[in-house]
């Protein structure tokens, strides 16, 4: 595997950059975060890469951080998610926002991404739930990382009780802002939400 490429940036296109190193120009497909601020042509650039080997092509994907590359590889482990869909997901926000959306079952946010419909968004949540570390993630204003972690567990519990990820997300969003951090109490409040419908 080619873990990283460092060299001179010689071209930037809509979906890739070209980095020259050792006389070879490497075409590297990248998410929006890389393409939005690649640096000046002729400047040195380093990307952490993932090489995808297919029958008809060898394709390099590049990322600003190792964490971003690891999340890309994790996304590829989900049935139905190819490299382009994974890039689109990474381009839809920061890695922290994406991990939090998956961990909390935010199917609506994931489904807004190009090439990711509602079914694939639900599959992402189902297959990656519990596999992503969300401890210490910066979250939306007014939501502490502790609340986000408890909500992620609550979402898993609701799904295991037979509710869809979307229903779980809606119930969690309806919890009062002053709801206690106790998981059992939050579960009781979420179930009360379903009973009031």
Swiss-Prot record:
Region (Flexible linker) location: 146-153
Subcellular location: Cytoplasm
Keyword line: Cytoplasm, DNA damage, DNA recombination, DNA repair, DNA-binding
Domain III: region residues: 153-197
Pfam families named in the record: HHH_5, RuvA_C, RuvA_N
Claim: DNA damage is one of the keywords in the record: yes
Matches recorded under InterPro entries: DNA_helicase_Holl-junc_RuvA_I, Hlx-hairpin-Hlx_DNA-bd_motif, NA-bd_OB-fold, RuvA, RuvA_2-like, RuvA_C, RuvA_C_sf
One of the protein's GO biological processes: DNA repair
GO molecular function: ATP binding; four-way junction DNA binding; four-way junction helicase activity
Residue span of region Domain I: 1-64
GO cellular component, one term: cytoplasm
Region (Domain II): 65-145
Functional description taken from the UniProt entry: The RuvA-RuvB-RuvC complex processes Holliday junction (HJ) DNA during genetic recombination and DNA repair, while the RuvA-RuvB complex plays an important role in the rescue of blocked DNA replication forks via replication fork reversal (RFR). RuvA specifically binds to HJ cruciform DNA, conferring on it an open structure. The RuvB hexamer acts as an ATP-dependent pump, pulling dsDNA into and through the RuvAB complex. HJ branch migration allows RuvC to scan DNA until it finds its consensus sequence, where it cleaves and resolves the cruciform DNA.
Domain description: Has three domains with a flexible linker between the domains II and III and assumes an 'L' shape. Domain III is highly mobile and contacts RuvB.
HAMAP family reported for this sequence: DNA_HJ_migration_RuvA (MF_00031)
Subunit and interaction comment: Homotetramer. Forms an RuvA(8)-RuvB(12)-Holliday junction (HJ) complex. HJ DNA is sandwiched between 2 RuvA tetramers; dsDNA enters through RuvA and exits via RuvB. An RuvB hexamer assembles on each DNA strand where it exits the tetramer. Each RuvB hexamer is contacted by two RuvA subunits (via domain III) on 2 adjacent RuvB subunits; this complex drives branch migration. In the full resolvosome a probable DNA-RuvA(4)-RuvB(12)-RuvC(2) complex forms which resolves the HJ.
Family: Belongs to the RuvA family.
Protein name: Holliday junction branch migration complex subunit RuvA
Originating species: Roseiflexus castenholzii (strain DSM 13941 / HLO8)
Gene name tied to this protein: ruvA
